């Protein structure tokens, strides 16, 4: 083997939103090199189709792939219309300050797909016997975009993990 990958997912409900936490661990079973690339790691693909209303915005206010692609941010929110409900559905992906590339640059495509991607910054290596850990929280909610609420969720996430 080359890499031992472990994922731990936890789910809870808070303030009318679902919080899905991911802790990803990669242990080098040999020396591993990951080359610079525009994608990699966690990626959230939305049920996009031509003509659907939706938007992506990051924590610094950049919108869509034309403004936010490859840029660093502590969170990214994807919102879109969903058939059968009046409000938009949203998934905010929160970066964690213990992640190696924090704030991580984000891959944001033109079809509302997003993912944090540390290899946007360049090559990285993991030595044999070394472990790297990446943490993210997905906040799933409906209604209008509320950047202040997402920022509170991010601060709570950081404080929880530090206790």
Q: Would you name each region that the model predicts?
A:
Residues 91-163:
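Beta-strand-rich recognition/accessory modules
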């Amino acid at each position: 083997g080359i890499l031992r990958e472990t994922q731990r997912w936890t789910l809870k409900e808070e303030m009318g939103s679902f919080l899905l936490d991911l802790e990803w661990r990669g242990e080098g079973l040999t020396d591993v090199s990951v080359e610079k690339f525009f994608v990699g790691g966690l990626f959230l693909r939305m049920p996009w189709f031509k003509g659907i209303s939706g938007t992506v915005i990051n924590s610094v206010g950049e919108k869509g792939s034309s403004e936010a692609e490859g840029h660093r941010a502590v969170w990214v929110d994807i919102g879109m219309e969903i058939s059968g409900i009046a409000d938009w559905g949203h998934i905010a992906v929160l970066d964690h300050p213990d992640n190696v590339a924090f704030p991580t640059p984000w891959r944001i495509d033109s079809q509302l797909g997003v993912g944090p991607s540390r290899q946007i910054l360049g090559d990285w290596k993991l030595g044999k016997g070394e472990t790297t850990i990446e943490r993210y929280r997905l906040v799933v909610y409906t209604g209008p975009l509320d950047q202040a609420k997402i920022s509170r969720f991010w601060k709570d996430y950081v404080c929880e993990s530090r206790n």
